């Protein structure tokens, strides 16, 4: 007779029985089990930060704080991103960066970006990518880099919806986020209404180097910002190789501000030349709306080979309605702007932007890859502004003597092509690339003073990134790129805005800034300790700067020009430590040395004018 020995083992339990069985079926003896292990908890911390050759990624969705925080609050945790006490966002210590949504430039951040970031709940964001060294496939604009915000889609079959409200001293919002996935169709949508208020006081004193005179302005400002933000995204998977995506974003709002100011002009002896008080009410209605369509094609021979066709339309309105009341005039106030008690200025600006893009990427071996693409952007901006005055509260509005009407059109076309190569072998990776951007723009004045002009330029933008991965958690990176900063319509608009004895206007003759950047960084991201340290050098030519001057009529003029050359060197340090699953400590710091010098050949500053320091 054959005999069999059966042993039974259960995790966490120990048995004290075994039985010898024959081929004949028999009933086994009683089985006794005792507990062998006490209760245990296995806790794994998923890394929130990932360092790659060309970017650093923070996983917002994996951070528990994303359930209650806004996107602006979460940015305080992202390496190389700083948010100051007034909620101004900087990347690599600079505010001249571009914000992308899902890998594409987004114009909804062009007006009041911090208000938009505050209105977006972090629960709808998947991750934030900090691209400090953009490669050839990215637009050349954005001096300090690109902040790419990747939103969540519908990840699971079915639907999900959430509602959120935020109440703070000067800010409140309410909104919702919903997703739907049904077979090959995915939809997600978001809407938020926000209301912010701010009150501030300022004391401004300016000394003129030419005559030693002084200009002083005391102001009390009360501003309210109601805004609406919404987005809708959808995708349909035709088959395993073809995907169609549609999306739209809407961001509209207005700011209502009340200014109470006191202006005074003093000579070098401290004697008052003139003084007056001014009350100003201003309403600014702004917004952006965008529609985007993408077609993505994968190839059977290599599922990582991809062709993408994209089209995007953006509409950006900006209307300003201002009324000034000048009173309590003392001294020499015979300036044209102050002859009337009331001044009214109305400005209507519109921008229509069309973008078509083709991208191709092919990692044809495990070591080598290539990418390339074409892009065409057409921006058409119009501005219509009027300026009127009247003597008394019940008087009739009449055209102002100083630029009563200006109407002009600004058309900008940017055609670009790029090519890049990728090499990855073992722990080494290398990504050189080149991008060509040809810009041509035309400015036409339909009414008012102004001379038509056009501008043509071709920029070659090289980029290079190399990386060495020391192990699974640490990475060393060295990179160089050239970045551009093009002036937007607010810098170019020649419309004169009058405020008492001050006027401000744009300069349609501005050209793009160029910034060369060289950086080196080390990253270590573990389960508890995260470190990213970087050093960088920047050389900027023809940086756009605002400058003020007082003309012969004692009027303060404010405008812009390509005036400054910048040299900068510094470092950034990011540290975060998680001693326990519920405790975290982080440090996001930077130290930069700046050397600012007047550009040779400029007509505003002497060439020996400079400023430097940390």
What do the predicted segments below correspond to?
Residues 25-64, 84-86, 92-96, 131-133:
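Short, acidic, small-residue-rich periplasmic hinge/interaction motif at the N-terminus
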Residues 71, 77, 104-132:
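Short acidic/polar hinge/loop motifs at secondary-structure boundaries
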Residues 71-74, 113-115, 130, 140-163:
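N-terminal periplasmic accessory domains that precede
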Residues 72-108:
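Extracytoplasmic beta-strand/coil segments of soluble accessory domains associated
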Residues 170-197, 213-259, 287-291, 297, ...:
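Transmembrane beta-barrel wall of Gram-negative outer-membrane proteins
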Residues 218, 353-355, 399-405, 505-507, ...:
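Outer membrane beta-barrel strand-and-loop segments of large Gram-negative receptors
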Residues 229-231, 235-253, 280-444, 469, ...:
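Face-selective signature of the C-terminal outer-membrane beta-barrel domain
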Residues 440-442, 472-517, 537-558:
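Surface-exposed extracellular loop regions of Gram-negative outer-membrane beta-barrel proteins
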